[in-house]
């Protein structure tokens, strides 16, 4: 059903309007008003002639009659009617001119022309006219009180100094016609086809390429003179574009479109009914020629294929600036880094014990410290063994998950810990506990077994990221599965500097207080000794 609906939406069919729609859209108001006024003038003159014999010469001219048909008033509808009839004929001539200027072809020729429009490549062009104004003077003669007075008039004249044109080069992005198909045109005797043209972009890459070429052209020409006039449009190569086509199903046009019939009805002031009937019998088809740019970026067989767009590749720069202002600097690994973390550990030169696999246990994650101290990488599914006497309690293992597992960490400092692990009395934890063993940290950029303060990573502490029969996850899923390393370097450094400055200020204050107290004590002692020596 969905495919049928899509096919129906991508098909254009002519439709014949009803009477109400014809009256609402094409009412021909001027012709209707002129026709009604002419009819009123005709009835007014007829009434005066029948009722009062205003236009017969039998009554004497000296008799004065009162009313609308009196002498003099009876000629007003006649003169007014003649003027309206001239205006009415001019309006009919303008209406007929529109039909004459419209291109009239057979239905087969119209379909061939539309096919040529669909297959022709588009030409999106830009034109610029650079110009400036020059100040000029001229002598003019003016008359004041009958005397000719010459004066100097200052005016400005436009001077075009440079003209240039360019077009959109779409060899890299490619194009394709996505216009609708036309059906059921042969069912109607007369079909009015209204043609329009436009272009759209399949992705942001094509739109950006178009905007870059357009802005480059205008930027190169806007500095050539003071002002610049811009023109742009779209054409189709090797095919002249026609906005309206009148297609006939028969070799000859129908009777209501014949010029003799039109002028016969127009002379009888019946042009308005004929036009309404013509519009009602004519089917209307609105067809738009649409060209799609950027097809090479969507086709996997093309060398310019970029793949489906993700949110991370189309994120607006405003969102990135907002994240930077909030100091939320997430160091997120790429898809290849996530998938190659296991290979980095496996290919190192360290002697690893036998490989073991640990089942992951998902634990609620506590808050991350705001400083850089004791930051531990917490990946989705990461486990760690805790060497303590309280590790006898075994956490029940959840059912196997269908998600990719990250690295496993184990704390093995000596042979006792290894034996303890081999006995199977270990506790799986999503985050390493804070014990006597120093915590180890892992950076996303690279994994080193000889980092300062950290020990080697054993083979038995690690497990594969994905199962052998499990397909790799998408990039967005991998980002959500691998928790980012959250470090606020600015805040940690600033806090350390603040603490150092605070401690140094405290030390200086204490030293100054001690010096002041010592000086005061010495002064008191000297004062006490001086009175004893004076007597």
Curated annotation (Swiss-Prot):
Residues 510-529 have a biased composition (Low complexity). It comes from the Eukaryota. It is found in: Membrane. Keywords: Membrane, Transmembrane, Transmembrane helix. The keyword Aminoacyl-tRNA synthetase does not apply. It is a multi-pass membrane protein. Residues 498-535 are annotated as: Disordered. This is Transmembrane protein 151 homolog. One of its GO terms (cellular component) is membrane. InterPro entries: Tmem151. The chain crosses the membrane at residues 27-47, 73-93, 254-274. The keyword Aminoacyl-tRNA synthetase does not apply. Belongs to the TMEM151 family. Signal peptide: none annotated.
